[in-house]
Regions:
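Terminal targeting signals and extreme-terminal segments of soluble enzymes
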Residues: 1-141
Length: 141
């Protein structure tokens, strides 16, 4: 990694300004050599009609943390990241509290990054398991 952990978390927070991530109150909280962790509050703003965490909000959290994590491995002055495929298995429901997304790299190629994102609750129960594929493109491509 080119930056220290605090600078990486500040950079990730800045990326969220005026975006869906800010709307969903996604906050990046931990970073390591091969992972990034974010959290999102579960409240009526992210519910589906039955009062449960919406799968789309969960997927938005997963793609956000996986895409931000890919930025850790590239020169952001020369390259940018785009999500090209995401899948999710929703395993447990959640009504309120906080969910955590931990993105861990599975494959780090020159142009393709594959991430596994585990969405867990405060007790580390697995809520959803997601897979994200990102492509690394030259800027202005």
């Amino acid at each position: 990694m080119k930056l220290n952990k605090e600078k990486i978390l500040q950079f990730s927070k800045k990326l969220s300004e005026n975006t869906l991530m800010e709307t969903l109150n996604i906050e990046y909280i931990e970073v390591g050599e091969d992972y990034l962790v974010a959290k999102m509050p579960v409240n009526p703003k992210v519910h589906q009609p039955m009062g449960l965490l919406h799968g789309g909000a969960t997927v938005a959290l997963a793609e956000s943390v996986g895409s931000a994590a890919s930025l850790l491995f590239i020169d952001t002055d020369k390259f940018e990241v785009r999500g090209i495929e995401i899948s999710a298995n929703h395993l447990k429901s959640k009504r309120e509290g906080v969910v955590y997304a931990t993105a861990k790299i599975i494959h780090k190629g020159k142009t393709i990054h594959l991430w596994q994102i585990k969405i867990t609750d405060e007790e580390d129960n697995l809520i959803s398991l997601c897979k994200l594929t990102n492509i690394v493109l030259p800027k202005n491509a």
